[in-house]
Amino acid sequence: MANDISLNYSDLLEMLAESQEVPKQQEKSPKMRSSYRAEGHEVSWELYNPFGRWSSRAIDVREGLNLSVVEWDLQQDFSLTIAEQMQPMFGFSFCVGGDFLTKIAGSDAEFNADPSEGHVGFFQGDVKTTNQAAAGEQVTLVQLGVDPCLLEALTDTPPDHALHPLNGIFSSTQEGFQWRAQKVTPAMAIALHQILQCPYQGLTRRVYLESKTLELIALQLNQLNEDQSSLQSSPTL
């Protein structure tokens, strides 16, 4: 039977922070313990529960650009529902290890995340997703959150401009979660490995991770451009 959890990400961080103030409660329940650390632009935490281990690192690599690395090492079937009220944001997601199913609330849409594909998405308004993974899965997930203003500055093109690679893929007026699957290329796989194995600390670490996240965004946008060019050049029957 799945261990169902329903919470907001901010609630989870509060719960982890509070748990550090009551270590005696954790001593009474050794199967459930946690650690939490906030340092500079990086927040990391780790939670041990009968369902398994769950860890997260979130880094603000620059204004408008967030990198997170999530890991699940599951002992039981697991279902996690996350509900958020979100400002407009583009997301790039890569399941580096393991696999899991994501369902989008309010629609029949769902997708399976695994190392062969990445996902480009656009979020705004009420966003509710449910992630399901089976016992025994060891999932590693790398996610990028990009403010539309930063993406516009990086590409020197508004997202609704005809030449922008995301124009026509996502609706700026539709609320919820829109997404599109993208093949993970060898170049993307190398950049992901370098993010996970970052050898630096402090300011050097932040600059290095910023360069790798921007590289991933560039590779994804290039693939979108190539896909659109291929569609436009295909003969109509």
Spans of model-derived segments:
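N-terminal functional module of multi-domain proteins
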Residues: 30-140
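Alpha-helical bundle regulatory/interaction domains
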Residues: 4-10, 20, 100-237
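Short Lys/Arg-enriched alpha/beta "domain-start" segment
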Residues: 1-44
